[in-house]
Amino acid sequence: PSYFDPETKMRGITLDIAKWKRPSPESAPVHAKAAGLYMICTLSKHEAEKKGFQDALMLDYRGYVAEATGANVFFIDGEGTLHTPIPDCFLNGITRRTVIKLAESLQMKVVERHIMPEDMADMNADMNCVELYCEVQ
């Protein structure tokens, strides 16, 4: 099953920027699948949907891009380099690591870095990835 219908996939999903932030590693077990952390994402997704968006982009406690509410985020720049946030306040899960390995196996340069929301304007494509769902927009 797909998270989004075919029309939405072709058009691309819209993301609101969540008002809630991913917490710092000193305040929650950010590298675990912890129920309290899911609440932040669930509330953010519901808020985004009320505003007409399909999902929300989660920023971390410093204002850097972290992830979508249920998916990792990746960006491709004009040179074909894959950029993804450093997983220092969210789970560095299997799907994320697999996407990175696949990109590297295709000889793509992968850069893990802190990404500010305004940096996204310089990217040619973005990708949201969660188990069984990974689409380039």
Language-model features and meaning:
Residues 1-137:
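Helix-start/capping segments and mature chain N-termini
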